[in-house]
């Protein structure tokens, strides 16, 4: 059952500016068409800023979203997603499932690494083996890769896994050269992307320069610089003064001011990130009771959070699977119902109310969410004590077995597939099962779901997984974040990514 991916779709999407991803840049340009149809000059450099520094430039090491706008422009994966989360070819041009556990890949020819060497099957095998050895990418059933010739490989799985292709879109699955040197690679990365590293000053800025031998054609802008600016209000100010062209993570209360400025623009995209609350299912206290966990969800008015704190830049979550993800299903959960919350508490033996503790970090939005939750839960008899501590402290305490009640957290479904959520957060064996959810029936249903192809059986298993999530309520999805980027009105061609891996190869900023 051969599945060749049509390249014409990519070409159309790039031309219309609605996505497309990776490639199609053509020759370097000095001018573009302006709003009046006349050619205008473009700047040699695009400067963007974000709040957090990078820990490494090595894309294959598990990283947070903060690294993606740099790493995704230095590296390429085998497959990628466009802005609508439709899978597109990248360094692999075709795939074929020879059987349920055998995947054959055809690789793109004529691809150069930044050091001038050719990308081939040896590099792909090395990369897949590398990320499997690290064991942090939910590769799961990977059972090795064999080289058929320079541009064909065969990947074996230990068991069927319909979600395996989505794993190959991860930034962490970007192809690196077989001569990879882990000790040096974090500071001197070598990829196949449209930009290569020019200069890096840790904690200050990172500058990339155009890679003229990029397989998709040279990027339109010569230089791309990311500045680290921790203070959110300063990022807005730098955009307003023209010191930067693009600002990430602008404060929600700055958005209306930016929208009113004719020299600036707000760009938005749906997101794979869900802001959520984890509930300790193994607690000896009240939250160990599923009726109490359901009562907590029924007490939360999620729409109020979106409207009052996010100024509408978010979508209420009916579960913890992003709406753009594969195998998302609209599903009735424990919706806002204060009277039902009181009834559930009484049913659990807590008609006089309870005291719970919520862990959160000091992020401004999280702090505000915690305060809203405190007010809403109080209305049904839940007295919420807020404890502010950094995320690493919370995670370390959980791993050490510390008892807790509730924790504000988030999960970004980077593969664009619901499997990433089930596998990553809800299995009893999941590294990130911070809710300490243990349900053997859920585990068994997941194992069958993960290895069952499309059809009625898989759909029935998926329904069971959703049923268990609602019945047991180990995690409450609050809202899906909208990606919001502020930019000069002279910016064109930036492709936003639902996981934050924004692509700049077709982006330009016009001059005055």
Where do the protein language model's features map onto the residues?
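Extracytoplasmic/peripheral linker and loop segments enriched in polar/acidic and small residues
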Residues: 385-394, 420-489, 512
